[in-house]
Amino acid sequence: MRTLTLIAIVTCAALVIFHAAAAEELEAQDVIQPEDIFTGVATLEEDRIFECSFSCDIKKNGKPCKGAGEKKCSGGWRCKMNFCVKF
């Protein structure tokens, strides 16, 4: 019984991780259907909350995610959880 419970928990955890990774990949590819109004709004709000909300002084390929004193990212860079991400 304990073995089955452990297998069920591990399987559920793996599915949650796989689903989160797939959602991140789809978000990065901007795959949002027009009929997904609520999903689109949630994605915009999420981007507004996380985009450049940290100092993001990390440099990627020698280019800063955002310039000194700037509040927004430029050049296609976005700050996500204090990492520079190219979109």
Curated annotation (Swiss-Prot):
Localization, UniProt: Secreted
Tissue and organ distribution: Expressed by the venom gland.
PROSITE patterns (UniProt xref): HWTX_2 (PS60022)
Pfam family, one: Toxin_20
GO MF annotation, one: toxin activity
Propeptide: 24-48
UniProtKB keywords: Disulfide bond, Ion channel impairing toxin, Knottin, Secreted, Signal, Toxin
Predominant location category: secreted
Coiled coil: none
Disulfide bonds: 52-65, 56-79, 73-84
SUPFAM superfamilies attached to this UniProt entry: omega toxin-like
UniProt record similarity statement: Belongs to the neurotoxin 12 (Hwtx-2) family. 03 (juruin) subfamily.
Protein name: U3-theraphotoxin-Cg1b
Organism the protein comes from: Chilobrachys guangxiensis (Chinese earth tiger tarantula)
